[in-house]
């Protein structure tokens, strides 16, 4: 399922930057529990929030979706 694959990719990228879920969620103005559910593939995330995550990770949308 794409939500699970995307969530795993987001988590991998966040961890590679040494960020906790809480600190990252706060930095992109997203509720931590909502963000955690995205990483766990339990949310159908909007493109607006996907863009927030990509910007927070300082990567392009193309890079975010690579390997998804």
Protein language model regions, located:
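A short, Lys/Arg-rich alpha-helix, primarily the initiator
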Residues: 1-16
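Helix-turn-helix DNA-binding elements, focusing on the entry/boundary residues of the two helices
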Residues: 10, 21, 32, 47-50
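Alpha-helical residues within the helix-turn-helix
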Residues: 15, 26, 55
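Short alpha-helical DNA-recognition segment
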Residues: 19-37
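DNA major-groove recognition helix of helix-turn-helix/homeodomain DNA-binding modules
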Residues: 49-63
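Short amphipathic recognition helices of helix-turn-helix/homeodomain-type DNA-binding modules
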Residues: 65-68
């Amino acid at each position: 399922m794409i939500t699970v694959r995307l969530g795993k990719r987001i988590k991998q990228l966040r961890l590679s930057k040494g960020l906790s879920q809480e600190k990252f969620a706060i930095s992109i103005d997203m509720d931590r529990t909502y963000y955690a559910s995205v990483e766990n593939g339990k949310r159908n995330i909007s493109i607006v929030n996907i863009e927030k995550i990509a910007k927070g990770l300082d990567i392009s949308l193309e890079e975010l979706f690579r390997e998804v």
